[in-house]
Amino acid sequence: MDFISIEKGENLFWLGRYVERVYRTLNYLEGLYDVLIDTDETAYKEFCAALNIPDVYEDASDFMTSYFFDELNPDSVYSNLSRAYDDGILLRNTISTRSLAYIQLALDAMEDAKAEGSGALCSFEVIDRLLAFWGSIDEYLSSGQERCLVKAGRYLERLDLSLIHI
């Protein structure tokens, strides 16, 4: 039985949390995006309140742009994905370069969408990349202990978001 350092364990745990947070948030925002366009332009305020995110957005359009892409906003989808990537860089020898590449591809998809102005439409590609990441973790993370730490972070984040109905 190998020992895992506290730092490595934290990075594995938070990698799982950040990736799951982005995945779950994007899935939820797909439905919210339709509501914002079709019926209630202030529906994002409930989302912010549920996640305890400061409502610093001018309107629904500003929310969809800033909450998706603002790298200076610590609550944004992009910031969470960037933190997952930062943890992944530190763990590249553990999780494999291939697994890390899926997070990089998700970041690239977000950057391309921001440059093209396609906004929330990038969520499908990002979700696909994150699902590929989870499959890659199952395939290439050889240590059961390390895999369990990543999945513990994932499932705790899923539980946390489910409890607030996200």
Short names for language-model regions:
Residues 1-163:
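Alpha-helical transmembrane segments and their helix-helix packing motifs
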